[in-house]
């Protein structure tokens, strides 16, 4: 960083353009590579030694970084992908085209919006290709692209607490502070039956605890991908267009549900939640027609049904009780008529 920490450091290219060689160390410091002890020469492996007698202490032209050295499984999945095959058309899409160079961070903690903006939307405008998809803007907001485009990869429902007062996601550290706990003891605080799964009633108790601290909100649900190597294996024509995969009461897409607590390093803590939580009023930003139900709406519908039956039953009961009186009244009326 002694050289590359200079924000004026640039290199002239053959086309007459300048290539920026500056590395923002504060940003690099928190990158996933630096946090894991990956040094400059681990990636730029053709730098064997530095010669400080020269103005440029290493070869001025370096080989392309080979990410497969560490990310072998991801590289194999990528080999048979539409992005790799684009190379046959003269388009090169290396790893850093999506993931960036020196400031790579964990994506687990990112929302669908953040994941798409950092990667897919760099090149793709989804509005150009999804006219067949009903409610496409809703899908774009709550379903990660790879959920459909890498259908063989695992996915899960991510629930994050959204503060309705500040209109933003409540940071995990603030949520934990409000509950007087930490990452290690969160389940001890919330999971009353100690089965390592947060039930619907336990989630609602947690929301009530937050309300006592004047924190009012809802859980924001999204379908996101497990970041496994197979998410790189995306091919043209391989997307899942079967709506019933999600919009189905027995959909496997809703089996894995987690409350997600984000960490400063971009990773997260995932806490298993029972599927019935998706029926809660407090997850009212996540609803898939025929796939999930809102329990309070069911209760309202049931109450309306009972009210309707009560009116009919009450009317029938009144008719039965007053039948003798109505019969006598009719007989008197008939006598008067004679």
Regions found by a protein language model. Give the residues of each.
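C-type cytochrome heme-c attachment and multiheme electron-transfer modules
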Residues: 1-338
